[in-house]
Each structure stands twice: as C-alpha cells, then as structure tokens.
Amino acid sequence: MKIVGHKGGGSSVPENSRTGLEHALSLGLDAVEIDVWPTADRKFVLFHDADIARLTGHAGWTMHLTSDQLRTLEIGSRVSTEYTGERILLFEEALDMLAGKADLFLEVKRTRHELDRYTWVEERLSQILHECNALAWTTVTSFDHRSLLNLHEASHDVRIGMLYAGEWLSLQQEIDALEPVALLPHWAQTTPTLVKDAHSRGIAIYPWVVNDNEWMQEFSRMGVDGIITDRPEALIQLRQATARPIDKTESEGSHD
C-alpha cells in the first residue's frame, strides 16, 4: 500500500511547496499529491485555491496573475515563522525535484466558468509531462472529468485518475471513456465492494483524505492501493507495524 502525501508533504509543512516536497522525500513517501493552477501567462504553479488570499494575505485570482507575479508572494509564514520566505513553485520545478524519487498525483485546478477561456491547459500539460519524461510516474487527476477527457484525447499516454465524491455506479460511462488507471474517491465512499469492483477492472483505489488512525487501518485491511493523507508520518508507523514480523517467542507467549 502506497503512502501519498496530501498537498505535498502533509499538514506539518507549507502545502504545495518546495519545503513540503523536500519533507515528503525525506520521509521516503511513495508518492505526493499536489495541486496546479494555470496562470495568465500560460504556465502552471503549485497552488490549491482559486483565490490567493488564504495563503498569501493578498487579493487576487490565481488564474488571472502571471507566474512571475505569483512567485513574488510568500506562502510559508501562515504555517509557521520557520517557513517565512517560502515561495510558490512552478510545476516544472516540482517535476525536477520528484523525478526518480516519488510518484506524483497531479490535481489540475480550473474554475468551471472559465473552461472555454483556458482551452490550452490540457495540451500544454501533456507537452510538459512528455518533455520532462514524467509520464510513467505521474497520474493526472481532477474533479472536472470534462478536463480529463480533453487531456485523454490530447494524449492517450497520460495516466488518468478520477477524483470524485459521489457514487461509483454513476461513473461507469465516464470510466469507459477515460480509461483511468486510478480512482480517487472520498474516504466515506470507499467500500470493500468499490475496491473489489475497481480491481476487477484493473483500476487502483486511492481514498482521500485519510487522517484517522483507525480508518488508515481499515483501508489497509480493505486492500486499497494507497492512501492520501495529511499525516504521512502516522501512516508510515502503521505500515511499519503491520509489516513487522512476529517474533517466535512473542507468538509462543501469546498462548499463556
């Protein structure tokens, strides 16, 4: 079972940041999940929100600013003064950091009412993944399945992961069209039946966002392929405990 750091390295470090990715790599995580937004100058930056206010304290919309404008903004001090000076990353910078070290789940963000304005997004994203030789270890995800279909049509080489928070049975036509390698359901919609049905079709399951220890254990027993979490350290401990071989003397002593 893979451990996937949500928004990079989990909630103990600035989200979608260089420090977050460095933290994930230092933990030896199998994969990270990051968010990217397209910018006004047709680039991609690591950022979660449509509005920049929560992380930067400034007013503005991510899609309406250039990458240079966004990279002047500080995003670390709201987590801790230890991270003051943390800057927004370009997508290519993140790919360079992760190459050969961890797999990537890439959530593409875009406001629905501006889909027609940003028709270049899927083709450019496909180009970057090809240019950076990142196709084999990157899965592109989105709640916007129309965007995923555009990406799938732009390049069948891109690995698709479907994010959703609804019912599995309502997605069958979209699954047939998108041919995803993974489904990323909300943890509350993740059931043994879903895992079994998806696996029968060769589709991996990665529930999000799982932060409770008991649910981590439950999904591990359920046989999911990985867990997306804000608490990767806790999941590492769980996986290590589960994998620890039983000492013979401990086994004998258990019958006392």
What are these regions (language model features)?
Residues 1-256:
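Phosphate-group recognition and catalysis centered on beta-loop-alpha active-site segments
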